[in-house]
């Protein structure tokens, strides 16, 4: 019945030098645009879970340092009224990071404005088992078809975003 999820939104470059990486991480923790982006995802997750949970706790923001980038993360812990992993997954997908907010207008905008079909752009990767389940949002993928390779990637755009910077 316990659900542990996270809002992983808001990104800055990482660095091989620990002190440089730490400075960038501190900037990320204090940047209004990235905090807003992360909170949009937090609020969306909480709203989707509100009718299915007994308790809901959002932990303070942290920086997750990876090799090339650092992300802003807020863990969300909850106790579900009923344990149903498949329903939980369906309730949370597609995430705000994939579909945008408000969800339906964002999806309609994407279909109208983007000059291509997203096809395999994003989805869920993970496993279901009787004891526990674990899933993550897969935001990068590749499709090999005969002699061609198509790569899929994207960036989160919110008010205040610099689209060129998002691709860095």
Regions found by a protein language model. Name each.
Residues 75-168:
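Conserved hydrophobic core element of enzyme catalytic domains
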Residues 2-3, 149:
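Hydrophobic residues embedded in beta-strands of well-ordered beta-sheets
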Residues 4-111:
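Contiguous alpha-helical scaffold segments within structured protein domains
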